[in-house]
Amino acid sequence: MTDTTRKDMVGCYGNKKMFTPNLDALAQEGIRYENAYTCQPVCGPARSAIFTGTFPHSNGMVTNGVPLGANVKTIGQRLTDNGIKCGYIGKWHLDGGDYFGLGCCPEGWDADYWYDMKCYLNELSENERVCSRQPNESFQPDFSEEFTYAHRCSDRAIRFLDQYKEEDFFLTVSYDEPHGPSLCPAPYNTMYRGFKFEPSAKFTDDLKNKPLMQQLWAGDKLT
């Protein structure tokens, strides 16, 4: 799972200017959805639907910053109850409060592999934490792939797969990238220099005929 990735940001959906060979391979060898729509445009509630199979208005997570309902089970809990090893590595955003998470593994997931964004920040020095949350200034030579959250999530995922390859397992790898601040090491930080997406009519929509809540999420002021 990636964060804030539009359909036109991957090659398998027709944008040949995007170089995404691994995602394209997943689409070729797995399932590529042509008519899939999120039930909620906000991160936390959308994730709550994916991992519980229930609508946000049913599971209690109607906006960011609030936790799932206390009696709501995730897919990790249900599969663990049936003897399947479950791992969750990456951004969680379902425990309420801080965007980065609480650093605590919820019920139903392997605590040895739990690695939300709070866990990542705990590994960094004070200066590194500042760097990790700034807009991309990553042209300096000491900025490495190993520094990024995505790289560290991937390393843990590989270890999980190696450990449980002979067992029934369910693994979620949830990258915060390409969500801002969009840190990107070389050589990827120059691959799309000068590239611009085609403008969308939705970008200039003033939303005056849309529900008030939609206007609020877009930053409009109440009158």
Regions found by a protein language model. Give the residues of each.
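Active-site-proximal N-terminal segment of extracellular/periplasmic enzymes that hydrolyze or transfer
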Residues: M1-I31, Q40, T80, A186
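Loop/turn elements at helix/coil->beta-strand transitions in domains of secreted/extracellular proteins
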Residues: I31-E34, N82-K85, E166-F170
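Active-site-proximal cap/lid insertion segments
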Residues: T4-K17, D116-D155, R159-T223
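Alpha-helical packing segments of well-folded alpha/beta enzyme cores
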Residues: N22, N71, I75, C153-F160
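Catalytic-site neighborhoods of secreted/periplasmic enzymes
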Residues: A49-E146, R193
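Short clusters of hydrophobic/aromatic residues that line enzyme substrate/ligand-binding pockets
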Residues: V10, Y33-A36, M61, L68, ...
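Ser/Thr-centric signal marking residues that sit
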Residues: T2-T4, T20, T38, T52, ...
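Short, solvent-exposed turn/loop segments enriched in Gly/Ser/Thr/Pro and often Arg
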Residues: C12-K17, G30-T52, P67-L68, Y88-Y99, ...
